[in-house]
Amino acid sequence: MLILTRRPGESLYLGDNIRITILGMQGKQVKIGLDVPGDMVVYREEVYRRVMEENRMALETSNADLLAATQIWHDRTKE
């Protein structure tokens, strides 16, 4: 992990098109601004983890549905 020190109003770049600016600090919180390309999605970590978990659960459900449909089709072809 790269660790950097920045003051309010200072920025850093990730590549050529992502700028992160420190806007201010209040107690234990740091307010940051992100300038990112319009086609890039940005999530807070807790939201990202929830989305990933829901996607995983949806995939498991989809697999179960597919297996059930396959079994029904298989049973009908035996008749």
UniProtKB/Swiss-Prot annotation:
Subunit text: Homodimer; the beta-strands of each monomer intercalate to form a hydrophobic core, while the alpha-helices form wings that extend away from the core.
InterPro entries per the UniProt record, alphabetical: CsrA, CsrA_sf
Family: Belongs to the CsrA/RsmA family.
GO cellular component, one term: cytosol
Molecular function GO labels: mRNA 5'-UTR binding
Record GO biological process: bacterial-type flagellum organization; mRNA catabolic process; negative regulation of translational initiation; regulation of bacterial-type flagellum assembly; regulation of carbohydrate metabolic process
The gene coding this protein: csrA
Predominant place of localization: cytoplasm
UniProt-annotated location(s): Cytoplasm
Name used for this protein in its record: Translational regulator CsrA
Transmembrane parts of this sequence: none
Function: A translational regulator that binds mRNA to regulate translation initiation and/or mRNA stability. Usually binds in the 5'-UTR at or near the Shine-Dalgarno sequence preventing ribosome-binding, thus repressing translation. Its main target seems to be the major flagellin gene, while its function is anatagonized by FliW.
Keywords in alphabetical order: Bacterial flagellum biogenesis, Cytoplasm, Repressor, RNA-binding, Translation regulation
